[in-house]
């Protein structure tokens, strides 16, 4: 594994820039599981694989996989994936044991029934197949604030705050639930569905959200945990 990681790090087209740190950490985790034989499902795919504009990195990942399928409630076009399927994570439109790898990038936080979605992921994974989850950490100050705002503010007001710090199009921003967004909760849900965690990392927040409050946020960044949970689990049976 060490030699594989060394090889990946030598060729993977990462920038090493702070603004890209979260996406590049996630991409490296994916790369460790890709071979020319890999059958990969990106569940909740949206219009691209990564959050930042990292076209070369996204193309590199897809080219390393034998088969890549993108699935979402509504998908009309995708930057990198040509095979697109409409469907719900609660009822994946695939046969049992279809995929070697399933990825969920900033998806879990939107699910009202994460346990149901993970049961479906486990169903379509082969034995020994991997699930990689990249999702916000509820205990980070910014994520926790968003969770609180989602409870007390009208959704349109909350979306306005999100858009102030996010480059996504309005149609790509969805309501949040945060029902699987602590390491303890995510571990529990994965274990309950026969998925054993092999790696769990809390990724640090690259920078403050707002320029005007940067000094206060830098203090909060030292007092609260990192912003992102990056978890890799494998199907045991």
Labelled PLM ranges:
Residues 115-120, 130-236:
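S-adenosyl-L-methionine-dependent methyltransferase catalytic module, highlighting the catalytic core
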């Amino acid at each position: 594994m060490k030699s594989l990681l060394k090889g990946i790090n030598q060729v993977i087209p990462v920038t090493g820039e702070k603004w890209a740190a979260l996406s590049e950490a996630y991409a490296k985790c994916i790369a460790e599981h890709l071979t020319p034989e890999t059958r990969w499902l990106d569940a909740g795919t949206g219009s691209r694989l990564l959050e930042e504009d990292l076209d070369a990195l996204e193309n590199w990942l897809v080219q390393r996989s034998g088969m890549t399928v993108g699935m979402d409630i509504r998908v009309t076009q995708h930057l990198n994936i040509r095979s697109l399927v409409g469907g719900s994570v609660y009822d994946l439109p695939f046969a049992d044991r279809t995929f070697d790898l399933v990825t969920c990038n900033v998806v879990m936080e939107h699910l009202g029934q994460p346990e149901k979605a993970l049961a479906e992921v486990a169903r379509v994974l082969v034995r020994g197949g991997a699930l990689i989850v990249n999702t916000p950490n509820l205990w980070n100050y910014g994520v926790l604030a968003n969770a609180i705002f989602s409870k007390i503010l009208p959704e349109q007001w909350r979306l306005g705050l999100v858009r102030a710090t996010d480059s996504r199009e309005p149609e790509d921003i969805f309501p949040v639930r945060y029902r699987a967004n602590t390491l303890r909760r995510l571990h529990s849900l994965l274990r309950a569905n026969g998925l054993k965690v092999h790696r769990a990392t809390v990724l640090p927040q690259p920078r403050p959200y707002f320029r005007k409050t940067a000094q206060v946020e830098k203090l909060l960044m030292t007092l609260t945990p990192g912003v992102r949970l990056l978890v890799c689990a494998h199907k045991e049976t």
